[in-house]
């Protein structure tokens, strides 16, 4: 009688040794993101973090997000570190809108077969995003799931927790008619609208490696999402900020109203900035209407800030000193009846 074949987890497609190799590869990158509030090291069942002692009435602010179908382009063109930055940016930029300082970040990486080099590149990008935002990469999960993903495909999710003083929470309630609106420039499409971007590439039959303003089109499309946390924390220390809107999926039409009272509308001056070339390329090659562009993409504006008119000059000076491309983009007006809450003129 033959002896039954002994099966292992590796025979089923899950390589524990590869997972351990990944952990070893990322330890130094994770260490760079350490904050003094973090207790313990990688490898525990739960990650521990104290609240910073400077807060008297701390409020925790949480956020979760992904990178969407930008991942498809990243996988196809083997550019994995940038999507790690994207993952962090999409979460921490949402937290800063509430006035919150990001404390810690966790990631979820899922794939059918773990490629240690690819995963290392992704997590190194995540660590870079955490370093840019002053946030500790406190833990994560790597899920190798045979039969769930094709080939080299993988998916990402990020989770972030920040803290803000209770009396300093930004919720849009302070916004009033007459407030000024400052814009912060984006680095490109960030992490939104990529299903449409991929459709434009398909329909136009454009070569993603073609030159656009001195570098390949694909490099414009995979440019990491800009992280605004550190300059905005400095701005919040110095100025009476009434609201901030992170321009993500839904563009101008969907995101700005999220931080406006019902009786207020944002009047945006469309001639106050020039769209980065990549957006003009998408609009032309996809035959996309202007309304749809503003509904899908950030069109060069990653963040909008509402504040009193008399603080505009000082705020712009601070933001530019921090390296931001910042400008006056419009103001807040009273809204009558069923008027739209965003007007681009």
Swiss-Prot record:
<dbReference type="Pfam" id="PF00586">
    <property type="entry name" value="AIRS"/>
</dbReference>
<comment type="pathway">
    <text>Purine metabolism; IMP biosynthesis via de novo pathway; 5-amino-1-(5-phospho-D-ribosyl)imidazole from N(2)-formyl-N(1)-(5-phospho-D-ribosyl)glycinamide: step 2/2.</text>
</comment>
<keyword id="KW-0547">Nucleotide-binding</keyword>
<keyword id="KW-0963">Cytoplasm</keyword>
<dbReference type="InterPro" id="IPR036921">
    <property type="entry name" value="PurM-like_N_sf"/>
</dbReference>
<dbReference type="InterPro" id="IPR036676">
    <property type="entry name" value="PurM-like_C_sf"/>
</dbReference>
<comment type="similarity">
    <text>Belongs to the AIR synthase family.</text>
</comment>
<dbReference type="GO" id="GO:0005829">
    <property type="term" value="C:cytosol"/>
</dbReference>
<dbReference type="InterPro" id="IPR016188">
    <property type="entry name" value="PurM-like_N"/>
</dbReference>
<dbReference type="GO" id="GO:0004637">
    <property type="term" value="F:phosphoribosylamine-glycine ligase activity"/>
</dbReference>
<dbReference type="GO" id="GO:0006189">
    <property type="term" value="P:'de novo' IMP biosynthetic process"/>
</dbReference>
<dbReference type="GO" id="GO:0005524">
    <property type="term" value="F:ATP binding"/>
</dbReference>
<keyword id="KW-0658">Purine biosynthesis</keyword>
<keyword id="KW-0067">ATP-binding</keyword>
<dbReference type="Pfam" id="PF02769">
    <property type="entry name" value="AIRS_C"/>
</dbReference>
<dbReference type="GO" id="GO:0004641">
    <property type="term" value="F:phosphoribosylformylglycinamidine cyclo-ligase activity"/>
</dbReference>
<protein>
    <recommendedName>
        <fullName>Phosphoribosylformylglycinamidine cyclo-ligase</fullName>
        <ecNumber>6.3.3.1</ecNumber>
    </recommendedName>
</protein>
<dbReference type="InterPro" id="IPR010918">
    <property type="entry name" value="PurM-like_C_dom"/>
</dbReference>
<dbReference type="InterPro" id="IPR004733">
    <property type="entry name" value="PurM_cligase"/>
</dbReference>
<dbReference type="GO" id="GO:0046084">
    <property type="term" value="P:adenine biosynthetic process"/>
</dbReference>
<keyword id="KW-0436">Ligase</keyword>
């Amino acid at each position: 009688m033959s002896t039954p074949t002994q099966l292992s987890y590796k025979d089923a497609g899950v390589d524990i040794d590869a997972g351990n190799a990944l952990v070893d590869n990322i330890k130094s990158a994770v260490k760079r993101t350490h904050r003094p509030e973090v207790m313990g090291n990688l490898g525990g069942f739960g990650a521990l973090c104290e609240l910073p002692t400077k807060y008297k009435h701390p409020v925790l602010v949480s956020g979760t997000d992904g990178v969407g179908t930008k991942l498809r382009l990243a996988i196809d063109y083997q550019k994995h570190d940038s999507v790690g930055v994207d993952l962090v940016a999409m979460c921490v930029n949402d937290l800063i809108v509430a006035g919150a300082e990001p404390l810690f970040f966790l990631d979820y990486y899922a794939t059918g077969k773990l490629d240690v080099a690819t995963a290392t590149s992704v997590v190194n990008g995540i660590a870079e995003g955490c370093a840019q935002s002053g946030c500790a990469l406190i833990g994560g999960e790597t899920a190798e799931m045979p039969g769930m993903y094709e080939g080299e495909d993988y998916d990402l999710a990020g989770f972030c927790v920040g803290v803000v003083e209770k009396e300093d929470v930004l919720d849009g309630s302070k916004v009033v008619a007459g407030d000024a609106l400052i814009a912060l420039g984006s680095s490109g499409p960030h992490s939104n609208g990529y299903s449409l971007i991929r459709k434009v590439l398909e329909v136009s039959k454009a070569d993603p490696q073609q030159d656009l303003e001195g570098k390949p089109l694909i490099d414009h499309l995979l440019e990491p999402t800009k992280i605004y946390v550190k300059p905005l924390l400095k701005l919040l220390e110095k100025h009476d900020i009434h609201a901030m809107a992170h321009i993500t999926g839904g563009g101008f039409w969907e995101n700005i109203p999220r931080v406006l009272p019902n009786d207020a509308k944002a009047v945006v001056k469309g001639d106050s900035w020039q769209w980065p070339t990549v957006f003009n390329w998408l609009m032309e090659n996809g035959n996309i209407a202007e309304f749809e562009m503003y509904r899908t993409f950030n069109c060069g504006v990653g963040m909008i800030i509402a504040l009193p008119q008399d603080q505009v000059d000082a705020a712009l000076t601070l933001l530019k000193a921090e390296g931001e491309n910042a400008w006056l983009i419009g103001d807040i007006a009273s809204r009558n009846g069923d008027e739209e809450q965003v007007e681009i003129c």
